[in-house]
Amino acid sequence: MDAVAAEPVSSSTAGLPAQLRDLGQQNYAPVWRAMQRFTDARGEHTADEVWVVEHAPVFTLGQAGKPEHVLAPGEIPVLQVDRGGQVTYHGPGQLVVYPLLDLRRLKIGVRDYVCKIEQALIDTLEEWNIVAERRDGAPGVYVGGAKIAALGIRVRRGCTFHGLSFNVAMDLEPFHRINPCGYQGLQVTSVLDLGGPSGMDAVKAVLLDQLARQFGLVLQPTSALPDLSLPA
């Protein structure tokens, strides 16, 4: 997917309301299934939502994922999921954000959506004087050739689910057990390793502000969690 330039939405512009749900630490599968249910059930007037979570250790294989890119998972489970992209790792210390947005309401296409997420990440890192960039044909955000944030999205009936993972202050060893995003030997890094803060809350606040700015959203925090039960 090629990078597409996108102008940020001014923070002074009146935005569209979106519910912000902080799920804390959760296993991957219940959140994935809840995203699917939300997207399947939403209608024309359903308010957008943004979910924030830290996952327990898991490798996920996207729709383009090849099992041979999972080299030595060991005790970490591997899940085949319905997002785009290849294999990645989620674990504690990684900030995962799932924007559940109606692209028709926002009047943007998929390329602009991806570009806006990448720009929000780049602008977040700039807060700590970390210079990041896109790569043509390889969605995500990179610092000095090392990947610091991955994207894996799905769009159904014009509505997005899945999202981004941002390495904040985490154990990066599990990435050595896979070919991250399908690239052999791809280096990964984290905000902490680059001199940024170790606290998740500080990074979370800046990233959510940048995402709201890019998409013209007014995030409305709610303590209510989605139904995270798994089907029997």
From Swiss-Prot:
Q: Which residues form the active site?
A: 181
A cellular component term, taken from the record's GO annotations: cytoplasm
Question: Which enzyme class, named as a word?
Answer: transferase
Identify the metabolic or biological route this protein is part of: Protein modification; protein lipoylation via endogenous pathway; protein N(6)-(lipoyl)lysine from octanoyl-[acyl-carrier-protein]: step 1/2
Positions of the BPL/LPL catalytic domain: 44-219
Q: Which EC number(s) does the record attach to this protein?
A: 2.3.1.181
> Which reaction(s) are listed as its catalytic activity?
octanoyl-[ACP] + L-lysyl-[protein] = N(6)-octanoyl-L-lysyl-[protein] + holo-[ACP] + H(+)
> Which Pfam families does this chain map to?
LplA-B_cat
Its BP terms in the Gene Ontology are:
protein modification process
Q: Which CDD domains match?
A: LipB (cd16444)
In chain numbering, the residues marked as site (Lowers pKa of active site Cys) are: 147
Q: Where in the cell is it found?
A: Cytoplasm
The keyword Acyltransferase appears for this protein:
yes
Cite the binding residues for substrate: 83-90, 150-152, 163-165
Q: What does this protein do?
A: Catalyzes the transfer of endogenously produced octanoic acid from octanoyl-acyl-carrier-protein onto the lipoyl domains of lipoate-dependent enzymes. Lipoyl-ACP can also act as a substrate although octanoyl-ACP is likely to be the physiological substrate.
Question: Misc remark for this entry?
Answer: In the reaction, the free carboxyl group of octanoic acid is attached via an amide linkage to the epsilon-amino group of a specific lysine residue of lipoyl domains of lipoate-dependent enzymes.
NCBIfam families documented for this protein? lipB, PRK14342.1, PRK14345.1
As for family, the record states: Belongs to the LipB family.
UniProt protein name? Octanoyltransferase
